[in-house]
C-alpha cells in the first residue's frame, strides 16, 4: 500500500533500524527533519503520516507540532515512538518493543485507511446536504474497561472523565459487551493472569470485527505479537493510561463517525451521521407511511420510546448507537429533539415489542458517562397501533404513557 504523500520522520538522532523496513512495505518516501523544524516541515512536505521519535529534545516542540498536525485536512496521523510521558490528544502512542517493524507497518496502514476514508467523505460532502458532526469524536466514544484489580476504580474514573465507559469484571462479561455494542476501544487492566490475557487478545485478533479496535493492556508484558494493529502496552498511573489511550480511542471514534457520514451520504442525507439512525424528518416520513400501510393491509405495528434525563444528552446518543446496531433491518428509529429515542417495530405485536424493548433497555444500563457516573437508565414506554390510530395519535399516546411512567 502506497500513500498519497511522504512519511515525515521527526527525530534529533539517527533513524532507528526498523524505519528501513517501511521501504520494503511500500510506505515511502520517508523525509527526515529535526524537532525544531518539524512544524514548518509539515507545511512544506504535506506528509501523509508524521512519525516522531520521542528520544530527547522534543519537549518544547511537541505541543506546537501536535497543534500544526491537528489543523491539517484530511486527517493526518501522528505516531509518537516510545513516549515516556503524557501525549497530546492527537499523538498515537507506539512502543517499538525491540524494533518490531511489522507492528509499526500495521499501525501506519490502519491510520492511513482512516485518512483515505476522511478524504473520501470530504470529496463527497459537497454533493449532498449532509454535514460532518462538529463535536470532538472522543466525546461520543465508548470504551470497554475490563479488570478487577485495585486500580480498576481509579482507571474507571480517569477514563470516565474523557469518554463513556462500559465496565466488565470478567472476560465473559467483556465478550457479551463486545457482541452487543459499538465500542471505540478496550482497556484490559490488572486482575487477570498472563494466560487469560493472551487468550483474550488471541480471540480479538481472530475476529475481523475487532481487529482494528484499539486495545490497551496495562498490566502485562506482551510476550508475542497479535494481529491487532492498534494494540498498545501502556503501564503506569490511571491518569497516564487514560490520557495516552485517548488518541487511539479518538481515532477509532473518528473512523466510526466518518463511516456513518458516508452511509448518510449514500442514503441521500436521511441518516443521522452521529447516531446512525434516521433523521427526525426521515423518521416522520417513514413512520407516517408505515402507519398508513399497516392500517390498509393489516398486520402489527408497535412503537417503543426510550426517554432519558434531559441533562444527560450522552445517554440518548449511546442508546441510539445501541439501537442502530441491534434492531432488525425492518425496524427503524430516530433520536428525538426532546432527548428520547423512538423505535418502530414492523409486523410486531405489543407483547413481543415489550419484550424486545426490555432487552434493549437492559443493554443501555451498563454505560457510565463522565466523572459523576451518570448511567443510561431509560424510562421505556411501548404501544401498538389500533384501527382508529393515526401516526400522530400513536406517538401522542406513547409520550403520555412515558410521562405517567416517569411521574
Predicted regions and their residues:
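Conserved helix-loop-beta segment at the catalytic/binding core of cyclic-nucleotide signaling proteins
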Residues: 270, 318-353, 362, 366-373
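Two-component/phosphorelay signaling modules centered on CheY-like receiver
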Residues: 9-31, 148-171
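Conserved phosphotransfer microenvironments
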Residues: 15, 33-39, 48-75, 83-84, ...
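Amphipathic HAMP/coiled-coil signal-transducing linker helices
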Residues: 260-282
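Active-site-flanking beta-strand signature of metal-NTP-handling nucleotidyl enzymes
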Residues: 142-143, 273, 277, 299-310, ...
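Short regulatory alpha-helical coupling segments
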Residues: 278-299, 318-328
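Receiver (REC) domain switch/output surface
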Residues: 90-91, 98-129, 238-264, 286, ...
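Catalytic-core segments of nucleotide cyclases and related cyclic-nucleotide turnover enzymes
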Residues: 350-361, 377, 383-407
